[in-house]
Amino acid sequence: MWPNSILVLTVLLISSTLVTGGGVKGAEKGVCPPDNVRCIRGEDPQCHNDNDCKDQKICCYWHCGFKCVQPVKDSWEQ
């Protein structure tokens, strides 16, 4: 019972981190903004990495696909 509880807790913690989008780095430009959109199907990617983006934007999973978006300040860094 104990190992199963640890596994469930670990999975919940990881998935909550992925859903909020926190901590996804975009070089030194900032981090990806939170994306709470639930998708039925994904869109074709508009970028594959930050080098594909212009105007200080970064490549993030945003609204069902990878897109160049304006980064936000990382609230964990002071």
Curated annotation (Swiss-Prot):
Q: Which residues form the WAP domain?
A: 25-72
Q: Which InterPro entries does UniProt cross-reference here? A: Elafin-like_sf (IPR036645), WAP_dom (IPR008197)
* Main location, first listed in the record: secreted
Q: What are the annotated disulfide bridges?
A: C32-C60, C39-C64, C47-C59, C53-C68
Please indicate which superkingdom the organism of origin belongs to: Eukaryota
Example GO biological process: defense response to bacterium
CC per GO annotation: extracellular space
Task: Specify the protein name.
Answer: WAP four-disulfide core domain protein 12
Source organism (scientific name): Rattus norvegicus
Please name the taxonomic classification of the source: Eukaryota, Metazoa, Chordata, Craniata, Vertebrata
